Amino acid sequence: MKTGSLIAALLVSTAWVGSPLAAEPADMSRQIQAMEKQIRDMQKQLEDMKTGTQGAMEAVAREKAAREAAEKAAREAALEAGGTLVFDAGKQKVIPPANPKIVQSGTNRFTLSSADNAWTIAPTGRIHFDFGGYLNQNPEGTTGPGTVAGGKLTGGVNVRRARFGVTGRALNDFTYSLILDAGGATDATAAINTASIGYTGLRNTILEMGYFANFFVLEEASSSNDSLFIERSTPSTLASNFNAGDPRAAVGFRTWEPNYWFGAYLTSSTPNTAHALTKRTLGAYSRATYQIIETGLQSVHVGIAASHVFDVPNSGVGTARSFTMSERPELRIDPTVLLNTGPLGTLANPVTSVQIYNAESAAAFGGLFAQAEYFRTVVNRRGKTDATFDTGYGQISYTIGGRRTYTANCGCYSGVNPVTPFNPLKGDVGALEFAARVSVANLTDQFDPTVLAAAQPNFVNGGKQTNYTLGLNWYWNSIMLWKFNYIHTDFDRFNPRTAAIATPIPLGLKVDSLSGRFQVMF
């Protein structure tokens, strides 16, 4: 109670002093003195109480500060020792330090992970060792490929791919890859194959940039480890070589669910593109796919894609902006190209842009698998009509002891993982896949070999190539396999008629090839 309130209460209780019955003045003086003493006593009690409360609060604060200082010192000592100190039910407990761990996948591939799984690093690699030869070379002329003058195709061996690197995750939501390749169409020195960073913080979505394999067409979206034949088809290679091949600088995103995939990317040059060029390739592509059926054991897949090159490269100062479309007969043992348009642009008539359109389909029913794609390529040339090329392929396979399945994050199909790995002591043979493919690539446009070349200013004479391929793939386990291919190539091409030569000169070739590959991947 406050002092003012006490005085008011005492005055009220003594209000009778002013009444006719009031006491004598001496008695009243004594009563007032007694009340003043009571007030002073009560004030002293209040001050004593305030002083005691403040002291108690200060004591509690000192005790808390001392306890927190002791706990901090204990935690720091535990951290210096590599552990963590926690307090459970008033008792101290030291948790041992968390060490990195090794995580093993279902296919026995291992990853080194931090204790909290926020950081991972895993070795990755593939070795594709090819061997083969060419049989029954039947040229249609005397100067084209397969002739003494044009050069016979020769067999041999080739390390098609020898890639080694690391992949992993950083800070939970980022991925990274750094892979070098010492292989190639011919044996080569090591070069960058993949150097990329991705962000995966959004559900079923990756935002990525760097050098990496692109997803423009269905066959390119599948890893080279998972291709049905030793080489991808000529049509898909021609279509993706403009601005979406493997690997290529790109930035973009892809998103997916079990029944659809969509991606869009801005792309540029390959890792080995010369930096001296005054103009480089710059383009973009997008691809969308849909699973009409997807049950795990059965699937039906369709998709479309479009690519546009809007910045066409040249080869240096004062050179034409141009592309050349060329390709070998689906085997990389001999470097001879059959299909070859030559430069599609000149200084007077440069290539201004290129469009590629694609339709894709695939289906899997147990061990049965089929896939097909169609491509249309339009090359825009200043001062000339557009050059248009149609290409496509279809392939089918049947697997015993395994099957191909749909992979949602690439909108493509995986390779075969044998149900029972190869083990001759137990009589296990792994998995066997029997395959067939037909591909057609026609790089001839606005051309009639019976008409004078001068009368055909817009013609392109790259030839027409049809390949018939049979394949056998023998999967030992999840990381080792053999591939064997027989290819019959039918290549047609004529030199145009000239004023001096009235009859077109045939440059075609029919050739058979046998090839194999031993493949290791991890």
Q: For the regions a protein language model found, what residue spans apply to each?
A:
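Gram-negative bacterial Sec-dependent N-terminal signal peptides
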Residues: 2-21
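N-terminal periplasmic/intermembrane-space "pro-region" immediately following the signal or transit peptide
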Residues: 21-126, 138-140, 400, 404-420, ...
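Acidic-residue sensor for enzyme active/binding pockets
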Residues: 36, 63, 71, 219, ...
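A general secondary-structure boundary signal
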Residues: 42-49, 62-66, 126-128, 163, ...
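Short Gly/Pro-enriched turn/cap motifs at secondary-structure boundaries
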Residues: 100, 154-155, 240-244, 348-352, ...
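Outer membrane beta-barrel
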Residues: 105-312, 389-426, 431-449
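Outer-membrane beta-barrel pore domains
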Residues: 198, 298, 302, 306, ...
